[in-house]
Amino acid sequence: MLKNLKDLTLEDMKAKRLTLKKEYMDLRFKTVVGHVENPLKKRELRRDIARLNTIIHEYAIGIRKV
């Protein structure tokens, strides 16, 4: 799980979201092939991406200030 999201800058959050999306896609491909050590990791990644998307959107609409 992501810790201290409030400490990250907006650009760091966008970069972190991109790396999490890549990791999620890799995990999806491994699931299709059939070799996944921790199937719950997919759910955790999806939720972390959603958390980051929410915070980034809050910055975009002005709920959070930079």
UniProtKB/Swiss-Prot annotation:
One of its GO terms (cellular component) is ribosome. GO terms for biological process: translation. InterPro entries: Ribosomal_uL29, Ribosomal_uL29_sf. GO terms for molecular function: structural constituent of ribosome. Keywords: Ribonucleoprotein, Ribosomal protein. Pfam families: Ribosomal_L29. Belongs to the universal ribosomal protein uL29 family. NCBIfam families: L29. This is Large ribosomal subunit protein uL29.
